[in-house]
């Protein structure tokens, strides 16, 4: 009987998750807290203090000379310059990966400016690159919207698949009384859910296992993608979760135009094959009969009487998202807006930080559920003071 040598056994795909900037770094911390395994976490930031508090496996301080460790000041051009300054460090950290996620919160400085540079380096190394970006809330202002359009446009050019999460649509899923700071944390956690839903298809043992080649078939050179998340328990939980996922407020257009669909069903040991079939039938009936559909089922012992379904739809026609674009197309080289931090802005943020320090802590849930008025752990760490406030304080001293 022939013996299989160690060199003949296929190794697991190397997956690296890169959080660029504040929101990307927060998403990494949430993934670590949620127990996501089988991937390497890399935090990249211009803010040295944020990196100090990061739970990432590897931390890269972008642009030491360009920023002196005090952040990009909400200016994407500073983030871009910082990433180019640290290009060799980025390359070294990404080498050897089969798949890289680049997560950013578009609209600020570091994530907006540095995100596409990180993706560009990964593509140069021949790595499958998936971008996951959040669009800012409308109330964050016109400058952040312009910065976000610029960032998402540039990131989209450098990744195989780009998943864009519109934060405004999160407002349809949470209680109106949810505090502002908690709302931002919920937005960060959706980044986590997107990355985790895809990576666990490869890294976690399940009832139905997929390998890297399956995921690559859907996500390689796929362009813009949509993500939906559904969560349900009790009777008909599979049907309810599947319907929530494909009708998710996070999905800006109908998924019936998708040429590729990847979805993951996650549940406890009480999850049955019949439930997986029910979910699959609902999702497949919502897309074209010619779509390439790949799905998996992941087992998590801690999940009792609950199913979570993550759907990624890819391969849309180029004009599918045209009506969703506000003022910037992919080919537009419009420069991002330069940041202006005035005394009123500082006063308002100081007020919000004071409120956060005096507020009662929220109970943390292992999985944030954006469908049931989620609660997110409040962070009372004084080290979370924004970088531009630290610069302002330093200048006064």
Regions found by a protein language model. Give the residues of each.
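Tubulin/FtsZ superfamily GTPase core signature
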Residues: 1-397
């Amino acid at each position: 009987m022939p013996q299989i040598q160690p060199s003949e056994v296929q190794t697991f795909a190397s997956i690296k998750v890169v959080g660029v900037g504040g929101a990307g770094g927060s998403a990494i911390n949430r993934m670590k807290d949620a127990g996501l395994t089988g991937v390497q976490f890399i935090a990249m930031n211009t803010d040295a203090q944020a990196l100090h508090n990061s739970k990432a496996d590897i931390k890269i301080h972008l642009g030491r000379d360009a920023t002196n460790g005090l952040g990009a000041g909400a200016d994407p051009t500073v983030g871009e310059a910082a990433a180019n300054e640290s290009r060799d460090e980025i390359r070294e950290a990404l080498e050897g990966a089969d798949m890289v996620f680049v997560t950013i919160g578009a609209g600020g400085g570091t994530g907006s400016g540095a995100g596409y540079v990180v993706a560009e380096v990964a593509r140069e190394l021949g790595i499958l690159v998936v971008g996951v970006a959040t669009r800012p809330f409308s109330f964050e202002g016109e400058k952040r919207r312009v910065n976000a359009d610029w960032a998402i446009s540039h990131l989209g050019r450098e990744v195989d698949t780009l998943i864009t999460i519109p934060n405004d649509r999160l407002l349809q899923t949470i209680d109106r009384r949810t505090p502002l700071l908690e709302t931002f944390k919920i937005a960060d956690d959706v980044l986590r859910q997107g990355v985790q839903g895809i990576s666990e298809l490869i890294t976690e043992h399940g009832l139905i296992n997929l390998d890297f080649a399956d995921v690559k078939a859907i996500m390689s050179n796929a362009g813009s993608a949509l993500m939906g998340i559904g969560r349900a328990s009790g009777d008909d939980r599979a049907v309810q979760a599947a319907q929530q996922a494909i009708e998710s407020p996070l999905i800006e257009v109908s998924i019936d135009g998708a040429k590729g669909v990847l979805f993951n069903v996650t549940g406890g040991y009480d999850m049955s094959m019949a439930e997986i079939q029910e979910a699959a039938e609902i999702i497949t009936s919502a897309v074209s009969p010619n779509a390439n559909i790949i799905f998996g089922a992941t087992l998590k012992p801690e999940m009792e009487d609950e199913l979570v379904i993550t759907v990624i739809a890819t391969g849309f026609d180029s004009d599918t998202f045209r009506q969703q674009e506000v003022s910037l197309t992919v080919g537009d080289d419009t420069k991002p807006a330069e940041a202006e931090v005035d005394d009123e802005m500082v006063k308002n943020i100081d007020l919000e930080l004071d409120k956060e320090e005096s507020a009662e802590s929220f109970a943390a849930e292992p999985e944030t559920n954006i469908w049931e008025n989620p609660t997110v752990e409040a962070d009372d760490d004084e080290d979370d003071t924004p970088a531009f406030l630290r610069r302002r304080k330093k200048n006064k001293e």
